[in-house]
Amino acid sequence: MGRYYNGDIDGKFMFAVQGSDAGERFGAIEQESGYIDYVVYKEDSYKAIVEELKEIEETGAVDRVNKMFKDDWLYNDEKMKKFGVSSQDMSEYADHRMGKQMKDYFDNNPDESELYFTAEI
């Protein structure tokens, strides 16, 4: 159960914290209804992806969530409170994972000028 995105990058949206439109934060453009088909143009978006990742990292959310997930990936309100992790931190963490995939795709495929993926709504 859950919503997935697939294409040049693949993953699962974090349950209850990440919207299907998370890719738009990193320059993805919706292509079709039903599922959301996205394209990210390297020339237009790579710099923005790097900057957005840096902004997310500067909030400390990624570090806080990584610390919480150090021993296991299970979490609840009590565990989040113990580690000082907010719902917004979880959302930032989830979006960071997607943005990192986009950056890594372009870094690992230097000849590619665009990246495609389909997100479940």
What are these regions (language model features)?
Residues 1-112, 120-121:
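Acidic (Asp/Glu-rich) sequence patches and key acidic residues
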Residues 115:
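Conserved GNAT acetyl-CoA-binding A-motif
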